[in-house]
Every structure is written in C-alpha cells, then in structure tokens.
C-alpha cells in the first residue's frame, strides 16, 4: 500500500514517523545500523555510498546532537553536506520553508534532514517534494522524532538483546510534549515490547490515545519495580513557567532518577535519556555517569542509525 513515506512495494521513500512503519522495515534499519556502527564512531574509513549526492540539514530549530549526528552520518557515506541555518537564511526575509526546499531541490539537493517547531511541518514539505527527493524528520513539534526512536531501540537491543517480548520498559516525565516519547512508543509496540509503563505528573501525560495498552501511573517508585529499561525524558523548563510543574525541586523529588531509586528496578536496568540532560532534575550525576547509563551509547548509535536511514533512502 502506498503512503506518504512508503512506496507501492513497501519501501521507504521518506522517514517522517515510526507510526505505520512495518516491523520488517524497522528490523532491517536496526540490523543495518548494527552492522555499520563501528564505521559510525570513526573506526572505519569514509565510504562512498552517497558520493555525488547532496544532503541538506534544514533546521528551523536549534540542535547540537541531532544536527551533528546527521552531518557526520552523511559525510561518512560520502555525501556533499549543506548546513542550512534559519537564522541567516532568506526565511528571515519571509521565504517559506516550502520555497526554501524547492530552491534547494533546484540546485540538486536530493536529501533533506528537517527539524521544525510545528507539528506536521515535515510531512507538508514531503508532500511538496519532487520525485526522487527524500525527507527525514529530525523532529517536528511534539509529533515525531523517528531516528531518535530508532537509536533508542538499537541501544535497547545492545543492552537487552533482540527479543523485546519480555522487556518491561518505563518512560518517565513529560510524555505529553515529547516527540521522542511518541516515536519510542510506536517503535516499542511494533517490536513487541512485553510491557510499556508510562509515568509522570498528570499534567504531563497525554490524553489523545497514544498511551493505549500502556500501564500508566504517577507513582514512580511503584513503576520502577522489576523494570528492564528506563527512558527518562527531558523536562523543558517552560513547563514550570506554564504552571504544569510546581518547581524543578519538587519534580526531582517525585520523578528524578537517583541511585537509590534505580535500585528498585532490575539489577541491570538500562538508563536512557535523549539529551540534553538537566542534571539534578531528571537524573543525578551518579546515575547519568554510572555503569547502567546508556546515554553516550545512544549518541554513538545515533550516527550509525542515521547512516542506515540515509543509505536506505538515498543509496
């Protein structure tokens, strides 16, 4: 079935969301990322899969990890990489994102990695793109961040094995506003995770059906019991300004991951965080830097995953 991101043969033509991506496609991407992760962290030389292909990182929001990761991934595949900076571009003169895309297409750019503050913005750009152009959603609004979801799944596979059927995964924090949480939820369901628990203040839990089938609660200590993996979400400080969280201190008291709390989970529970970490809010230093932390592994895996996605779409 042809969709916005799948062609009539079920092959990816864009990566906009993990929702609706077939299990076989997810597994192929994860397997490929696993195969090339040594190259992704610099231990193998540059490849030429995308030699002569122009890729643009089209970011309308600030980013460090994601943008750098995509840049390295495209570079290591041999692509010509163009970094678009909205703060110095014609968008400041009123040019639309669509016109920016079409002008860059006219220059021969074939791949676009897009981050945008608005929900659905990347999907709208994909609809405007010409034949043979591929778009990758690097995060739009609160909708989706598919490559973050993929790198989280790769990290879980490395820490816990490829069979997710018995995994108990806890997602903690501001799920309501998190595009990472939505992508993780879609991926975990598709890969058959045994139990998905979602925990956070009532004001930060969504009510739009995304949590269907999850175990939902506000008691973090209870949710930790026997957990195999913890996905800690960044608390945006504007949530406190909006009155959704009384204070950072109270949030940490109720939902911060400390060494003592971590002991309630499985003895080898993996700790993930998409970054940037608010140390002392979501996670203490000793947990973030401890033996069970997978945070830097996530960062390294991000390059491998993005190489696999770029290779699949443009190779």
Curated annotation (Swiss-Prot):
Record-linked Pfam families: OTCace, OTCace_N
Key words, A-Z: Pyrimidine biosynthesis, Transferase
Pathway given in the UniProt record: Pyrimidine metabolism; UMP biosynthesis via de novo pathway; (S)-dihydroorotate from bicarbonate: step 2/3
Documented EC number(s): 2.1.3.2
GO CC term, one of those recorded: cytosol
Residues that span the membrane, as ranges: none
Catalytic reactions of this protein: carbamoyl phosphate + L-aspartate = N-carbamoyl-L-aspartate + phosphate + H(+)
Highest taxon of the lineage: Bacteria
GO biological process, one term: 'de novo' pyrimidine nucleobase biosynthetic process
UniProt GO molecular function: amino acid binding; aspartate carbamoyltransferase activity
Residues that, per the record, bind L-aspartate: 93, 179, 234
Family that this chain belongs to: Belongs to the aspartate/ornithine carbamoyltransferase superfamily. ATCase family.
Oligomeric and partner information: Heterododecamer (2C3:3R2) of six catalytic PyrB chains organized as two trimers (C3), and six regulatory PyrI chains organized as three dimers (R2).
Role noted for this protein: Catalyzes the condensation of carbamoyl phosphate and aspartate to form carbamoyl aspartate and inorganic phosphate, the committed step in the de novo pyrimidine nucleotide biosynthesis pathway.
Name of the molecule in the record: Aspartate carbamoyltransferase catalytic subunit
Lineage: Bacteria, Pseudomonadati, Pseudomonadota, Gammaproteobacteria, Lysobacterales
């Amino acid at each position: 079935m042809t969709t916005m991101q799948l062609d009539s043969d079920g092959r990816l033509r864009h990566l906009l969301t993990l929702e609706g991506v077939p299990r076989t496609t997810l597994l192929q991407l994860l397997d490929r990322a696993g195969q090339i992760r040594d190259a992704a962290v610099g231990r193998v030389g540059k490849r030429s899969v995308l030699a002569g292909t122009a890729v643009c990182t089209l970011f309308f929001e600030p980013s460090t990890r994601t943008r750098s990761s995509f840049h390295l991934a495209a570079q290591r595949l041999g692509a010509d990489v163009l970094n678009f900076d909205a703060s110095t571009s014609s968008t400041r003169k009123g040019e639309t994102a669509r016109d920016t895309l079409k002008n860059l297409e006219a220059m021969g750019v074939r791949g676009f990695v897009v981050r945008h503050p608005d929900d659905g913005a990347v999907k709208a750009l994909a609809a405007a793109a010409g034949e043979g152009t591929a778009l990758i959603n690097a995060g739009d609004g609160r909708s989706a961040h598919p490559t973050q979801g993929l790198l989280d799944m790769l990290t879980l596979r490395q820490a816990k094995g490829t069979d997710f059927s018995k995994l108990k995964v806890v997602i903690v924090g501001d799920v309501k506003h998190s595009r990472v949480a939505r992508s993780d939820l879609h991926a975990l369901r598709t890969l058959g995770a045994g139990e998905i628990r979602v925990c956070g203040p009532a004001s930060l839990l969504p009510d739009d059906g995304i949590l269907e089938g999850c175990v939902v609660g506000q008691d973090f200590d209870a949710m930790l019991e026997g957990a195999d993996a913890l996905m800690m979400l960044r608390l945006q400080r504007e949530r406190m300004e909006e009155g959704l969280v009384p204070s950072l201190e109270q949030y940490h008291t109720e939902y911060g991951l400390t060494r003592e709390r971590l002991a309630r989970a499985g003895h080898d529970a993996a700790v993930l965080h998409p970054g940037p970490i608010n140390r002392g809010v979501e996670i203490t230093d000793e947990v973030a830097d401890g033996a069970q932390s997978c945070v830097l592994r996530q960062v390294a895996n991000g390059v491998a995953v993005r190489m696999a996605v770029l290779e699949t779409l443009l190779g």
